[in-house]
Amino acid sequence: MLQIILRRLMKALLWFAAGSALVVLVLRWVPPPGTALMVERKVESWFDGEPIDLQRDWEPWDKISNNLKIAVIAGEDQKFAEHWGFDVDAIQAAILHNEQGGSIRGASTLSQQVSKNLFLWSGRSYLRKGLEAWFTMLIELLWSKERILEVYLNSVEWDEGIFGAQAAAQHHFRTNASALSEQQASYLAAVLPNPRQWSASHPSGYVSRRAGWIRQQMRQLGGDEYLQGLNSSRRW
């Protein structure tokens, strides 16, 4: 009996691995029609008795401002071009910080955030973390860095029901994602740790200071030259 159970479990795991790899491979070229986070937000709104309309318009890489691309990297994951999905130094620093009793600090890379937003539910369980690591490895193996950032910018939440760069640009600044200035981009990047509590268009003092720091980091990264190097980091 035990052997039968183990064989069935192994078969199920193999089917899951093959199926998830196929989905990630398809999404290398096909825009994701939605995300797990969008479904979660919609269900939450139904249970709260206040259904919301989700706003999201997919924009290809060349229709998104370089300012926003650099701002998000500067604010969220400055080792994005170097790592293969996991920032070991940031993980170690977060563990040490959390053990010392500070507020819980995350260390998720952009690749990990894409995995979580696209495929998984919110929470901190070991199962979810394990699945996040699996999807992160698949994404890093099968997508270019450019594609990872493109999907991130079209999937990330920027306010209640606002998903992706185009919806965020229109909602906060009444402009298009392609026209975002350095300052506007820095404010959008500054609210990403908590986009439903912080506002890019009506920033608090903390958000304004964080946006100023992000602009400094954008210039140190090298701006458009950094993106040119990122574009050349294709896998195959």
Curated annotation (Swiss-Prot):
Predominant cellular place of this UniProt entry's protein: membrane
Recorded superkingdom: Bacteria
Class of the enzyme per the UniProt entry, highest EC level: transferase
UniProt keyword Membrane, yes or no: yes
Transmembrane feature ranges: 12-31
GO molecular function: pentosyltransferase activity; peptidoglycan glycosyltransferase activity
Gene Ontology BP terms: cell wall organization; peptidoglycan biosynthetic process; regulation of cell shape
A Pfam cross-reference name: Transgly
Protein's membrane topology: Single-pass membrane protein
Keywords: Cell inner membrane, Cell membrane, Cell shape, Cell wall biogenesis/degradation, Glycosyltransferase, Membrane, Peptidoglycan synthesis, Transferase, Transmembrane, Transmembrane helix
Pathway entry: Cell wall biogenesis; peptidoglycan biosynthesis
GO cellular component: peptidoglycan-based cell wall; plasma membrane
E.C. number: 2.4.99.28
Disulfide bonds: none
Catalytic reaction annotation: [GlcNAc-(1->4)-Mur2Ac(oyl-L-Ala-gamma-D-Glu-L-Lys-D-Ala-D-Ala)](n)-di-trans,octa-cis-undecaprenyl diphosphate + beta-D-GlcNAc-(1->4)-Mur2Ac(oyl-L-Ala-gamma-D-Glu-L-Lys-D-Ala-D-Ala)-di-trans,octa-cis-undecaprenyl diphosphate = [GlcNAc-(1->4)-Mur2Ac(oyl-L-Ala-gamma-D-Glu-L-Lys-D-Ala-D-Ala)](n+1)-di-trans,octa-cis-undecaprenyl diphosphate + di-trans,octa-cis-undecaprenyl diphosphate + H(+)
UniProt key word Nucleus: no
Protein location: Cell inner membrane
PANTHER family per record: BIOSYNTHETIC PEPTIDOGLYCAN TRANSGLYCOSYLASE, MONOFUNCTIONAL BIOSYNTHETIC PEPTIDOGLYCAN TRANSGLYCOSYLASE
Function: Peptidoglycan polymerase that catalyzes glycan chain elongation from lipid-linked precursors.
NCBIfam families named among the record's database cross-references: mono_pep_trsgly
UniProt cross-references to HAMAP family, sorted A to Z: PGT_MtgA
Family named by the database record: Belongs to the glycosyltransferase 51 family.
Protein's name according to its UniProt entry: Biosynthetic peptidoglycan transglycosylase
Provenance organism: Pseudomonas syringae pv. tomato (strain ATCC BAA-871 / DC3000)
